Regions:
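M16/MPP (pitrilysin/insulinase) zinc-metallopeptidase core fold and M16-derived inactive scaffolds
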Residues: 1-71, 122-123, 139-143, 260-294
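Acidic/histidine-enriched alpha-helical segments
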Residues: 38-44, 95-114, 125, 179, ...
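Histidine-acidic residue clusters that define the catalytic metal-binding segment
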Residues: 68-71, 78, 86, 126-170, ...
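Non-catalytic, conformational "gating/processing" segments within enzyme and secreted inhibitor domains
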Residues: 106, 120, 124, 154-188
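An aromatic/glycine/proline-enriched structural segment found at the starts
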Residues: 171-227
Length: 302
């Protein structure tokens, strides 16, 4: 895996959707896997060794992170591990972003945008400005703006890439039956030429404003005929630096127990003669889409 601590939340208004677009471009030509007469692309090379695109080779873009992965690679075969590390290396700083490939991908993204533009997604997107009144999270869905996808100049996606894909915001995760020392040495050698930029932009983690009165958000769409209700009880997110503390782990265990017991009671209600809902659950997680706020949530639907 190569995990980027960046996502659609860091896009400028004219870049809405380009974090996700960039994820697509990572498979359309890199320095060592150009996908032209100079060499195989990432997908064709992976498929020559049995790594199937969509199953063992994939990526996702969310609001605060973007993650690429290669899994079930046959590393017992000579050179496969080295080549997989080279792909991660290229994704980190050497995606080609050629003009013609960008233009070809616009059509792919348009189709994905069309197929994903469901009633539930529209409701979800429409609710964000009410839930996050005035906050950055009010307009941050990774699928972005179709107008931007159709018309953005090439420079905008390159600016996003070179501004945010950099070593201090990246992590490499390797899991498997490997010799740790050998793989670590290979990793350091492969990534030796990837340098942190001078005076990099600050990676801001946008806060969620507290509210004095309850926020009520109602979303409707003609395609959504399964009514549901959710209630969130917000609180500040736990800093990452505290998540290895015994106190935090004990608190998480207690919260998990509370959710389990409450879910058991909700399940009993669902199975009663005349239940008030057909599905219900409780959970503790990020507040809707924001990682800088957490919430205990209850949801129910008919």
């Amino acid at each position: 895996y190569i995990a980027q601590k960046v996502g659609s939340i860091l896009e400028e208004p004219q870049q809405r959707g380009l974090a996700h677009f960039l994820e697509h471009m990572a498979f359309n030509g890199t320095k060592n896997f150009p996908g032209d007469d100079k060499g195989l692309g990432v997908i064709p090379w992976c498929e020559t060794v049995g790594i199937k695109f969509g199953t063992n080779l994939n990526a996702y873009t969310s609001i605060d992170e973007t993650v690429y992965n290669i899994s079930n690679a046959p590393i017992d075969r000579t050179g496969v591990l080295d080549s997989c590390l080279l792909i991660l290396h290229d994704w980190s700083n050497y995606i080609l972003l050629k003009d013609d490939e960008i233009d070809k991908e616009r059509g792919v993204i348009r189709e994905e945008w069309r197929s994903r533009n469901s009633g539930m997604l529209r409701v979800y997107t429409d609710l964000l400005p009410t839930i996050y009144q005035g906050d950055k999270y009010a307009d941050c869905m990774p699928i972005g703006s179709i107008d931007v996808i159709n018309n953005f100049p090439y420079k905008d996606i390159r600016d996003y890439y070179h501004k945010w894909y950099r070593p201090d915001l990246q992590g490499i995760v390797i899991v498997g039956d490997i010799d740790v020392d050998t793989v670590e040495a290979k990793l350091k050698a492969v990534f030796a030429d990837v340098q942190k930029p001078v005076n990099p932009a600050e990676r801001t983690y946008y806060p969620v404003t507290d509210n004095k009165e309850p926020i009520v958000a109602i979303g409707t769409d003609k395609e959504v005929d399964d009514p549901s209700i959710e209630i969130y009880f917000k609180q500040d997110a736990t800093p990452d630096s505290e998540k290895n503390n015994v106190g935090y782990l004990a608190s998480q265990y207690m919260t998990s127990m509370i959710s389990s017991m409450l879910n058991a009671r909700l399940s009993e209600l669902v199975q009663s003669a005349n239940p008030p809902f057909t599905r219900a659950s409780s959970y503790y997680s990020d507040f809707f889409v924001a990682k800088t706020k957490e919430a205990f949530a209850l949801s129910a639907s008919r």
